[in-house]
Amino acid sequence: MVTIDLITGFLGSGKTTFLKKYAEYLMDQGLHIGILENDFGAINVDMLMLHELRGDQCELEMIAGGCDAESHRRRFRTKLISMRMCGYDRVLVEPSGIYDVDEFFDVLREEPLDQWYEIGNVIAILDARLENNLSQQADYLLASEAANAGKVILSHADVATREQCEDTVAHLNRALEQIRCDRRIDPKKDILQKNLTDLTKEDLEEVSKCGYRLESYRKMDLENGQSFDSLFFMEEKIKPEALERAVPRLFSDKSCGEVFRIKGFVKNGAGQWMELNATPDSHTMQSVAVGQEVLIVIGEHLQEDKIREILKEEETCQS
């Protein structure tokens, strides 16, 4: 049977960064792996971010979002059936930061997938600097993605204080209580607290054997509530410098809505692709070999006109 791992994490927690390290570790062990990417929205930016992993030992597959839950479930099942024919030793599933974890378990219980795949690990990535004031829907996602995790990795721990790390674990346990889940995260047993880029071979070996839990909790219907939005800005022709100025405004200006994450690609003056990855606490802009002219803004109650207005203002602003 093919071992399949699920890697979850709320928006901007660092799932893709972790996935790169984890995939490299597995390939170093001689494994042939398949990575199944699922993004929240119709365009899968994370596929481009993982482009460098593609090679003889690693293939990338994708399921685009932008559809209803039942259609997405069918796509997931169909993709797993086709990936079974590829001879992978392990499949890594990285869903979007907005994901119904039950879909993973439910689909893998169906025939013939239950005869082809065995669940190895459920790994949850959580930003150690978690925002205290999250909506009820965001807290639900946070708790549901961690409830069944064999290991919770506190990312960005190198720039978080001890108090922030403790508050984040306490917040997670409150969120678990709110959804009537009996599990409580034990910082000593369940948490790996480390900067993702500093994970060692020993750390990754531990994570690769962490397993998973099967917990029950009260479900919330996120689809009908339309809690989260994703907006796509195609071919905005905005320069990296202007985007750097716009990003803090988009997070701080509440007339834009509650922005959780901004990611995408723009070209600099030399024609080089630049990758943006931003959360309210930090953002990076770095050169990459492959890109697509698109910005994706993810959050709650987003106001497209206001966001577009800020992008245009910064592009026309003389620095």
Could you say what each language-model-derived stretch is?
Residues 2-8, 13-135, 140:
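Nucleotide-state-sensitive switch-loop elements of NTP-binding domains
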Residues 111-117, 142-144, 169-178:
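A short alpha->loop->secondary-structure connector
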Residues 42, 148-151, 159-291, 302-305, ...:
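C-terminal accessory "lid"/substrate-recognition subdomains
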Residues 92-93, 151-154:
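Short glycine-rich or small-residue beta-strand-to-loop segments that form or flank ligand, phosphate
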Residues 124, 155-158:
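Internal, well-ordered alpha/beta segment that forms a basic, Gly-enriched binding/recognition surface
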Residues 95-98, 136-143, 147, 159-166:
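Short, amphipathic alpha-helical segments
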Residues 1-2, 291-292:
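A short, charged/proline- and glycine-enriched loop
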